[in-house]
Amino acid sequence: MSIKKISEIQPESFEFSKSNSHEAEKEIKKYPKDRKASAVMALLYLVQKQNDNWIPLAAIKYVANLLCIPYIQVYEVVTFYTMFNLSPVGKYFVQVCTTTPCMLRGAKKIVDICKKNISKNQNELSENKICSWVEVECLGACVNAPMMQINQDYFEDLDESKTNEIIQTLLKDKLPKAGSAKNRKNTAPEKGKTTLLEVKNA
């Protein structure tokens, strides 16, 4: 179970938007009627995506009612998985990988930029309330270190200049282009592929 701060300020109610309600129905239909509780992760993902990256208690009750399961069962899922947030993190949620490969390639400088421009401490909203940051463990993109995740997108091969540019763009309420800051194609070498040169689109 992860340690999470539950927001003291909670909305009185929650319900899916029309499009997310349709998506929720599609997820639920993937399972037999007596197993629709299996859709809980997918529905919580939709909640968080709709609600600026966090899940209010009213939404937990809403999902429990949709799936016809006890409130505590959904609450257990939300508090177990670190990708679910129980307090506001802003429209743009920055997760900085500080595991060994990223640290060796400059993640500390990325953290310093977040401290300077977003908030002094982790899990605190920026002055304009649209952005927050946190250090996380490996995000599985070690070959593109250092990197960070913003909402659902990866920003890779970062340096101080590019990181600062990205953060400033977020604070202006704009989402910058995701991917490699060095325009690498996936995990290919920076100067292009060095093997399988005779194979097209290898």
Indicate residue ranges for each PLM-predicted region.
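Signature of N-terminal electron-transfer/Fe-S-associated modules in redox systems
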Residues: M1-A202
